[in-house]
Amino acid sequence: MNKLLLLILFECIIFLSCSGKGSLESEIPKVSLIIDGTFDDKSFNESALNGIKKVKEEFKIEPVLKESSTNSYLSDLEGLKDTGSNLIWLIGYKFSDVAKSVSLQNPEIKYAIIDPVYSDEPIPANLVGMTFRSQEGAFLTGYIAAKVSKTGKIGFLGGIEGEIVDAFRYGYEAGAKYANKDIKISAYYIGSFADLEAGRSVATKMYSDGIDIIHHAAGLGGIGAIEVAKELGSGHYIIGVDGDQSYLAPNNIITSATKDVGRSLNIFTSNYLKTNTFEGGRLINYGLKEGVVGFIKNPKMIPFELEKEIDNLSSKIINQEIIVPYNKESYEKFIKE
């Protein structure tokens, strides 16, 4: 009889031990990250990857990472769901529509999207979007470009024309015109964020036309432009994007218009993991005021006096004394004022 009681007691202990372990593991949320393209773009996607790496280090989690493309979005997101993910990050405006549809289909999963393009339609309660006033940082880099250009001709190289890239373009052009109303600006789009050779080809043409500074927002196409500037040498300059890209061509990159996707991702995810709260159904907007967009200071390329001018402009933007345009319509209005 005593042996039977001991056996039952032992089995109960084993059961409770296993149950406790399962509960503990289930309390640790699983985070996933899906991108369009590759993580090694040295700008936008890589910034998101760096942000999730910091979360991994802080919380000792193993995030699920997925490189995807348009035709695979739904199947890849279904795969992330099957991993047991509690929070799924979608990086880039191309996920705008699919983010809404999967959120509605899976109300038990939290979704967060970077750079969504939404109008006034409702956002599901389990979806949050993060948008950026990229035009504010680009305004500052445009001002710098107009001030340091030797030829009086500067350019913009974009990936795919649309709301996200246009914010960089028109902010940049507005800043340049604010610095020098006579500056000549040319803009080109290569129709892709993944075409390095197209970036090289268009950048080569731009430099041959007398443009000495190119601001890119073209993903891998921008990397191609950086390669061309580096090969051509002195007098051929680039303004990078999203993060500090100066390490790619220290003698040719004047500055970078930063949009710290990784930081915003890190802040939101860390708060979610610490508090287990998720405030969805909304868009969160970041700009200079929040310290998420800006520019990289570079004493080698940007004189101290010019840096002081930029700091003054930053304050005016933060205080809304300057409202930076973000599209063609607001840009045309801005330069007429």
Swiss-Prot record:
Keywords, in A-Z order: Cell inner membrane, Cell membrane, Lipoprotein, Membrane, Palmitate, Signal, Transport
Secretion signal, residue range per the UniProt entry: 1-17
Annotated compartments: Cell inner membrane
Gene3D superfamilies: 3.40.50.2300
Lipidation feature positions (S-diacylglycerol cysteine): C18
Quaternary assembly: Monomer.
Protein name: Basic membrane protein A1
Gene name tied to this protein: bmpA1
